[in-house]
């Protein structure tokens, strides 16, 4: 009887320590399809127009073309940005009068930025709607839930 009781206690402990059984495991392609559906729904529900998309699911709209000087991998970029979730909650922004500095192609920012910033020129502005696989994927943080589609408005201030 004690042995049976010990086994039951052990099983309860093991199952209570496991990950939430409500989590759904998706393949990358399934998640991308879901993200694209969310993005297209967001665009439609908000009556947005003028967006283009890439095969990787990145949707974008160039608001200002800039001066025809495009960034290349290895360039240092100064950008101003605002990031938000599809529900409109802002999770990050660059400081006023202090652009964010990054090196394009270095991997220090999410893939969606690495790809999207090559679509605008110096002094240009773009809106990027980034599927989770080009952002933080299944990783969550305090302000960004796992598998979140992210929206960024980015102005490329300077290329060095």
Label the predicted regions.
Residues 17-160:
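Cross-family detector of peptidyl-prolyl cis-trans isomerase
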Residues 1-10:
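Sec-dependent signal peptide recognition
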């Amino acid at each position: 009887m004690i042995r049976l009781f010990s086994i039951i206690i052990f099983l309860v402990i093991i199952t209570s320590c496991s990950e939430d059984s409500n989590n759904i495991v998706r393949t990358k392609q399934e998640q991308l399809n879901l993200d694209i559906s969310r993005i297209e729904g967001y665009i439609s529900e908000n009556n947005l127009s003028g967006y283009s998309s890439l095969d990787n699911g990145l949707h974008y709209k160039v608001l200002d073309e800039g001066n025809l000087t495009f960034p290349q991998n290895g360039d240092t970029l100064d950008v101003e940005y605002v990031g938000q979730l599809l529900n409109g909650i802002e999770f990050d922004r660059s400081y006023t009068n202090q652009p964010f500095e990054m090196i394009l192609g270095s991997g220090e920012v999410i893939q969606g930025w690495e790809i999207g910033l090559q679509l605008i020129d110096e002094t240009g502005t773009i809106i990027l709607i980034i599927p989770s696989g080009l952002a933080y994927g299944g990783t969550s943080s305090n302000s960004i839930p796992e598998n979140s589609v992210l929206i960024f408005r980015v102005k490329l201030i300077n290329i060095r």
